[in-house]
């Protein structure tokens, strides 16, 4: 996809985010270009994401960052994992309207997907504003290949969440590589991307039953 087509695809996404079908608030629509899309694009500063051949976007929702990454990385294969049917419908429409040939909607829980075709096949997993770090790491681990990476978009750093993740890391076969401060848009403060790497085979206990990673995250004991 040429640069012009990439920009055209993102313009279509902005248009779609302004429709009633979009799973995003009206306030978020007004901030979509300057905040949400800019924030999504910031992940491309991380080389491991740019180099990934197969990427999963966890809890894709409105496709931020998944649709943005798909538009900017046309050679990569992107699976948008989302369990809510209305959001899946939006993502499917967006893929068609944006002309993305490299993106697919996986309309099921990530835990279920990780028990089948999604197990240990992704070079990178992206997740933006979907939960606690330990929860995100647990959901990502069974999807990632050994050595694959998780990029978790977060706001201000939380000592509590980072300690919880530290206690859970060995159990999840995940290790923290970097916590990178980001400034994706004017006036942005306290934005971070947490970069984690899978450091072994998926533990046998993963994935747990759907919902358990959020309800009782490892490391919270």
Where are these regions (language model features)?
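Bulky hydrophobic/aromatic packing residues
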Residues: 2, 33-38, 55, 69, ...
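S-adenosylmethionine
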Residues: 73-79, 83-221
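Class I SAM-dependent transferase core
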Residues: 1-56, 86-103
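Conserved glycine-centered beta->alpha loop in an early N-terminal alpha/beta scaffold
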Residues: 59
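Conserved SAM-binding loop of SAM-dependent methyltransferases across substrates and taxa
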Residues: 62-75
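Short amphipathic alpha-helical segments, especially helix-boundary/capping motifs
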Residues: 14-21, 69, 139-144
């Amino acid at each position: 996809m040429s640069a012009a087509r990439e920009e055209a695809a993102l313009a279509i996404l902005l248009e779609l985010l302004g429709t009633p079908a979009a799973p995003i608030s009206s306030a978020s629509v007004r901030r979509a270009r300057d905040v949400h899309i800019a924030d999504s694009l910031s992940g491309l500063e991380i080389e491991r994401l740019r180099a990934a051949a197969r990427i999963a976007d966890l809890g894709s929702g409105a496709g931020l960052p998944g649709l943005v990454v798909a538009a900017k990385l046309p050679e990569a294969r992107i699976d948008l994992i989302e369990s809510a049917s209305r959001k899946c419908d939006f993502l499917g429409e967006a893929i068609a309207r944006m002309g993305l040939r490299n993106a697919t909607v996986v309309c099921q829980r990530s835990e279920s997907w990780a028990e089948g075709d999604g197990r240990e096949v992704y070079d990178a997993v992206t997740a933006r504003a979907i939960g606690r770090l330990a929860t995100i790491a647990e959901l990502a681990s069974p999807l990632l290949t050994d050595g694959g990476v998780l990029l978790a978009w977060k706001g201000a750093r939380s000592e509590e969440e980072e300690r919880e993740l530290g206690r859970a890391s060995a159990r999840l076969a995940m290790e923290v590589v970097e916590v990178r401060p980001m400034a994706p848009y004017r006036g942005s403060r306290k934005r971070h991307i947490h970069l984690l790497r899978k450091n072994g085979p998926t533990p046998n206990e993963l994935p747990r039953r759907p919902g358990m990673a959020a309800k009782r995250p490892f490391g919270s004991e």
